């Protein structure tokens, strides 16, 4: 791992900062039932989430019912349910708040770049991480491309123009996140506690593969010495 000073960490949200899988699965199964479709098992959702809610719906729906109209119908049931129940079982992963505390105390800036819809992203950050001064909280928005398109990371970096690209790292739990960082030209951190596998992350040669949040702290703070 090459030493480089880090001043901004851009985080993915689901599977990286927060364990959201149970609430996402419950909301999607609620929508499937409302649409007259069979539900999915919880573990199936680990591979379905992470590419925006429309792709979540397409993946969860039976193959013969993946029309645009059905995706719209799924959204109409999913959003009200998830907005009400998004914090029922969702929690920060162990060690996340301690990591953020240590990094913030060292002067590291934070941003979030997620494929979760914007209102949902903002609500969860406010609920669980409201005390931290995120420079940007960015989710999926109408007319904006989703990850792995790098635009969302570039937009987050534009919020702190005094920080160079070489001082930025993007942190996530999936191949989509690793590709997003690569496409944006920044270093990547893959986290093994999220929704995807170590092998999926290692295939994209992350700057750091972290087994726990403490390892992120150690790597970032060591490079400041």
Task: Please report, for each region that a protein language model flagged, where it lies by residue.
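N-terminal helical cap/lid subdomain that shapes the substrate entry/recognition surface
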Residues: 2-98, 105-106, 119, 130
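Asp-based, Mg2+/Mn2+-dependent phosphohydrolase catalytic module
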Residues: 2-9, 43, 104, 118, ...
């Amino acid at each position: 791992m090459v030493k480089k000073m880090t001043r901004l960490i851009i985080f993915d949200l689901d599977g990286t900062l927060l364990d959201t899988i149970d609430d996402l699965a419950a909301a999607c199964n609620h929508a499937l039932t409302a649409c007259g479709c069979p539900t999915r098992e919880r573990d199936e959702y680990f591979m379905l989430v992470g590419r925006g809610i429309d792709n979540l719906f397409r993946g969860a729906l039976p193959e013969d019912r993946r029309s645009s109209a059905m995706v719209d119908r799924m959204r109409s049931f999913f959003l009200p349910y998830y907005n009400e129940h998004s914090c029922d079982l969702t929690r920060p992963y162990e060690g996340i708040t301690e990591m953020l505390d240590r990094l913030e105390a060292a002067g590291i800036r934070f941003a979030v770049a997620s494929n979760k819809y914007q209102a949902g992203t903002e609500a969860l950050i406010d609920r669980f991480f409201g005390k931290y001064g995120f420079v940007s909280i960015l989710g999926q928005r109408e007319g904006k491309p989703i990850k792995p398109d790098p635009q969302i990371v570039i937009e987050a970096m534009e919020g702190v123009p005094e920080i160079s690209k070489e001082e930025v790292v993007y942190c996530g739990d999936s191949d989509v996140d690793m590709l997003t960082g690569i496409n944006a030209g920044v270093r990547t951190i893959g986290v093994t506690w999220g929704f995807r596998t170590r092998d999926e992350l290692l295939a994209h040669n992350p700057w750091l593969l972290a087994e726990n949040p403490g390892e992120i702290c150690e790597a970032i703070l060591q490079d400041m010495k």
